Regions:
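A short helix-loop-beta-strand connector motif used in the catalytic cores of GNAT acetyltransferases and
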Residues: 57-70
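Conserved GNAT-fold acetyl-CoA-binding loop/helix
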Residues: 35-55
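Acyl-donor (CoA/ACP) binding surface of acyl/acetyltransferases
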Residues: 1-36, 68-190
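Hydrophobic residues in alpha-helical segments
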Residues: 29, 38, 60-62
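Polar/charged alpha-helical tracts
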Residues: 55, 59, 159-160
Length: 190
């Protein structure tokens, strides 16, 4: 089995989301804030959550070496939310995104996790153009994106989604992105 990178911050572990996280993902995907701001994914059982992880997370992880990370609090190993780098259909470039269970919002976890994922995306995965999308009424997400250094660019629509979304962008200097670390895809190591 290929081993993918995990990350760590002062309070958090960021581990690639796997089928072991299916029960947690079921809860997150059906939380009121996920439904309101991201949308109903029609995942209603642990089995459907495992299938969602296989098709949306594992497939991208195998293809690119990064995807969705389950955010775990170090002190008690509780799963708080997710943060990741996504290759979304209809969006050129890599999208940084995050979602937390309502009881773990407004505690700085999303910013802490997203700063580390942003750093890893730039320094370890060589991402030179990072984007983010959010709905117009998700002001908390917009503020967090601005704290990450992303700037509002324009309104966009994604395929199969009639809602206009706010697009935020961050262009990374190519030299800075590759100067500190060169990422080697796990499958290229023999």
């Amino acid at each position: 089995m290929t081993r993918y990178r995990s990350f760590e911050t002062e309070r958090l572990l960021l581990i690639p989301t796997s089928e072991d996280d299916a029960a947690f993902m079921l809860k997150l995907l059906n939380s009121p804030t996920w439904i309101r701001y991201i949308g109903d994914r029609n995942v209603h059982s642990v089995e459907e959550a495992a299938a969602y992880i296989r098709s949306k997370v594992t497939a991208q992880l195998e293809r690119l070496g990064y995807a969705n990370y389950t955010v775990i609090r170090k002190t008690d190993q509780e799963k708080l939310g997710v943060c990741g780098l996504y290759d979304r259909e209809g969006l050129e470039g890599i999208d940084i995104g995050f979602a937390f269970l309502p009881e773990h919002e407004k505690k700085g976890y999303a910013l802490e996790a997203a700063l580390e994922i942003k750093r890893a995306g730039i320094e370890e995965f060589g991402i030179t153009q990072m984007k983010a999308i959010t709905v117009k009424d998700n002001v908390a997400s917009q503020r967090l994106l601005e704290k990450l250094g992303l700037k509002f660019s324009k309104l966009v629509e994604l395929p199969n989604d009639p809602e206009e979304l706010l697009l935020y962008e961050l262009k990374v200097d190519d030299e800075a992105a590759h100067a500190k670390h060169t990422y080697i895809h796990p499958e290229s190591i023999t």
